[in-house]
Structures are given as structure tokens and as C-alpha cells.
Amino acid sequence: MNESEDNEMQIIITGGGGFLGQKLARALLQGPHPFTELLLVDIQQPQSPLPDPRVRCLRADLTEPGVADSLISERTAVVYHLAAIVSSHAEQDFDLGWKVNLDTTRTLLEACRHARPGIRFVFTSSLAVYGGPLPELVNDGTALTPTSSYGAQKAMGELLVNDYSRKGFVDGLVLRLPTICVRP
């Protein structure tokens, strides 16, 4: 990026209307991070967690052709890909689970690849990639043995991020999160 592009830095959060997306957006807005636009994208209209002119909220279906390409540009610095169908829903609706949890990940990676190399791509995975009970110590050598469609989708998403990173298309980071239950 050149200096003028640095002044036009965009951060995108998919799943920006969800629990994690809102927490992340708030942290970014309150932090020292230099950006000109924080784009919150969700299947339902997201809201900004704080009043800030840098925030743009967009209702969009990332499974629709062309949507990812319309969001990501040369000024995109970071994509936080938090959008997903949760485990039970991915089991109940096999096709939708694959479409949202894997196909959308690849579509976003492709949009980053074509916009410019090196966009930071943060993918939220899940401990479901390990399947049943976890060993006492989980490290990089722990085998991925998903026992659900959701776990398989997240494991394949991780492999995609790793491969796109290896090729220099994105600067990928995978975060394996535990189950997060949000209740009022």
C-alpha cells in the first residue's frame, strides 16, 4: 500500500451484528487503530455498537454471487470473518452449513486475493475441529478429527486460509474458539 492508501484503510467484520462482531467492533472503535471505515456486514441489518462516523453497517447475504467482491477493495486492510451458521444449525441443514461456513470463506478469500495481496484475513474457527473430548494439552500437532459437519467445515476453512496464506494471497490468521453461548 502506498501512503495515500494507508489513509483510506478499511476494516471489515462479517457477522458484524453478532455477539463477537459487536464486541470486536467496540474494541476497534475504542482502540488506537488507525482506520477510516469499519464495515459491519451481517445477514440482518447490524447496528454500530458506538456512535462513530467511521462505521458503516450493511445488510448483505455473503452467499450471494458478487457480494464479497463488492465489499473488498484495495483499501481493505483487514477482514475479520466471524459470520457462520452455528453447529446445531449446520447439522440440521447440511447444504446451508456448507454454503455459509465453507463456500463463503472461500469466496471472501478469493475477493481478497483479487483486490490485492496481503490483506489480513482473520478466520474464526472452532474447537469442534478436534471432535470428541479434548486431550489435556492441545497444540499445533493435535490431530483434527471433526465429528460434525460444522467441525469439518471449520477444519476445511482453516486449510483454505493456510493455503491462501502460503501462496501470499492473504496474511491469514486462524482463531480456534470454544463454544460461545450468549444468553440475555
Identify what each model region corresponds to:
Residues 14, 41, 79-83, 121-127, ...:
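SDR active-site strand-loop-helix element
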Residues 132, 147-173:
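Active-site Tyr-X1-5-Lys
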Residues 64, 78, 104-107, 142, ...:
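Conserved cofactor-binding/catalytic machinery of classical short-chain dehydrogenase/reductase
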Residues 10-34:
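N-terminal Rossmann NAD(P)H-binding glycine-rich loop of SDR-like oxidoreductase domains
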Residues 52-64:
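Rossmann-fold cofactor-recognition segment
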Residues 62-100:
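NAD(P)H-binding glycine-rich loop region in Rossmannoid oxidoreductase-like domains
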Residues 106-148:
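Conserved Rossmann-fold NAD(P)-dependent oxidoreductase catalytic core, especially the SDR/UDP-sugar
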Residues 92, 96-107, 144, 152-153:
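Glycine-rich NAD(P)-binding loop of the Rossmann-fold in SDR/ketoreductase-type enzymes
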